[in-house]
């Protein structure tokens, strides 16, 4: 079983890791029960890699902002772009993991991104806001963060293996 949002992520075969892979772009998420690798590139965005180590079910999201701003269109709030906001992306990811058979009490997290990659944004450190949001959200949900690489001033490329929880950067 697999689930994703409105816009289907790009699937390909990764020769380096010898595995089917799914590339996530900003505002996308993907949940799978299969042995696949999920890949994304992050700047100020954050990716939450969640998995149930007992079932091997896992998924990743890639959100751009912590919450919906007041000027977002009604379409963005309710349809395909909802996953670009952390508040929706996290709920959707957790709900789809449970629908796929994961036990919410067993879900573990690894979170990445939130870099300050555009230094001219002095007033609004979006990466910091994203990083604070994801750690607070997971704490509230009772989902432990086993690994993280958040904030700082660099971009990241994340390779996540949901079946076993391994992550490479």
Regions found by a protein language model. Name each.
Residues 116-127:
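Phosphate/ribose-phosphate-bearing ligand recognition and processing surfaces
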Residues 127-169:
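Divalent-metal-activated hydrolytic enzyme cores
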Residues 2-16, 20-36, 40, 54:
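Phosphate-centric recognition/catalysis
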Residues 11-12, 27-28, 34-39, 47-49, ...:
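A generic local secondary-structure boundary/capping motif
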Residues 48-49, 53-103:
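Glycine- and Gly-Pro-enriched alpha-helical subdomains that act as flexible
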Residues 33, 52-56, 161-164:
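Short acidic-glycine loop/turn motifs at beta-strand connectors
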């Amino acid at each position: 079983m697999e689930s994703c949002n409105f816009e289907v992520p790009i699937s390909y075969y990764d020769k380096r890791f010898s595995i089917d892979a799914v590339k996530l772009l900003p505002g996308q998420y993907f949940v799978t029960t299969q042995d696949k690798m999920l890949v994304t590139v992050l700047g100020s965005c954050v990716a939450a890699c969640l998995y149930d180590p007992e079932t091997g079910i896992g998924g990743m999201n890639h959100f751009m902002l912590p919450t919906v701003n007041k000027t977002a269109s009604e379409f963005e709030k309710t349809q395909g772009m909802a996953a670009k906001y952390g508040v929706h992306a996290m709920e959707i990811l957790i709900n789809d993991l449970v629908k796929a058979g994961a036990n919410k009490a067993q879900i573990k997290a690894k979170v990445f991104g939130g870099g300050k990659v555009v230094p001219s944004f002095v007033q609004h450190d979006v990466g910091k806001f994203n990083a604070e949001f994801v750690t607070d959200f997971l704490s509230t949900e009772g989902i432990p963060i086993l690994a993280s690489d958040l904030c700082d001033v660099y971009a990241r490329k994340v390779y996540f293996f949901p079946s076993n929880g391994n992550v490479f950067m």
